[in-house]
């Protein structure tokens, strides 16, 4: 599936990426190749293949949760570029 330059620009806008014209051309080619690979996978007959949730049969070994004292807010915010009361302040990204 060949993507158009406009489609790549639209995806870049949605991802809030600013691309140079060279990057737009490169991503048009690369994303088209990825979509071609996905189309190939979609055309495979996998009816006889049993579903798997994990590639290996090992189970996760998790440690027990143990509560312990945390850092005081002053110490954890000591190197923060911006803070609001006892929280990190970050730029708003959703309009």
From Swiss-Prot:
Coiled coil: none
Matching SUPFAM superfamilies: Glu-tRNAGln amidotransferase C subunit
Keywords for this protein: ATP-binding, Ligase, Nucleotide-binding, Protein biosynthesis
Gene Ontology BP annotations: glutaminyl-tRNAGln biosynthesis via transamidation; regulation of translational fidelity; translation
Top-level class of the enzyme under EC nomenclature: ligase
Example of a GO MF term: asparaginyl-tRNA synthase (glutamine-hydrolyzing) activity
Origin superkingdom: Bacteria
UniProt xrefs under InterPro entries: Asp/Glu-ADT_sf_sub_c, GatC
Pfam families linked to this entry: GatC (PF02686)
Catalytic activity: L-glutamyl-tRNA(Gln) + L-glutamine + ATP + H2O = L-glutaminyl-tRNA(Gln) + L-glutamate + ADP + phosphate + H(+); L-aspartyl-tRNA(Asn) + L-glutamine + ATP + H2O = L-asparaginyl-tRNA(Asn) + L-glutamate + ADP + phosphate + 2 H(+)
EC number from the UniProt entry: 6.3.5.-
Disordered: annotated segments: 51-95
Record family assignment: Belongs to the GatC family.
Function per UniProt: Allows the formation of correctly charged Asn-tRNA(Asn) or Gln-tRNA(Gln) through the transamidation of misacylated Asp-tRNA(Asn) or Glu-tRNA(Gln) in organisms which lack either or both of asparaginyl-tRNA or glutaminyl-tRNA synthetases. The reaction takes place in the presence of glutamine and ATP through an activated phospho-Asp-tRNA(Asn) or phospho-Glu-tRNA(Gln).
Stored NCBIfam families: gatC
Subunit structure as annotated in this protein's UniProt entry: Heterotrimer of A, B and C subunits.
Name of this protein: Aspartyl/glutamyl-tRNA(Asn/Gln) amidotransferase subunit C
Gene for this chain: gatC
């Amino acid at each position: 599936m060949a993507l158009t330059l406009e489609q790549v620009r639209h995806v870049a806008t949605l991802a809030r990426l600013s691309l140079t014209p060279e990057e737009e051309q490169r991503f048009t080619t690369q994303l088209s190749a990825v979509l071609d690979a996905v189309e190939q996978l979609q055309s495979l007959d996998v009816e006889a293949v049993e579903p798997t949730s994990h590639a290996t049969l090992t189970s996760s070994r998790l440690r027990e949760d143990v509560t312990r004292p945390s850092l005081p807010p002053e110490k954890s915010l000591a190197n923060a570029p911006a803070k609001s009361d006892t929280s990190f302040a970050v730029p708003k990204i959703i309009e």
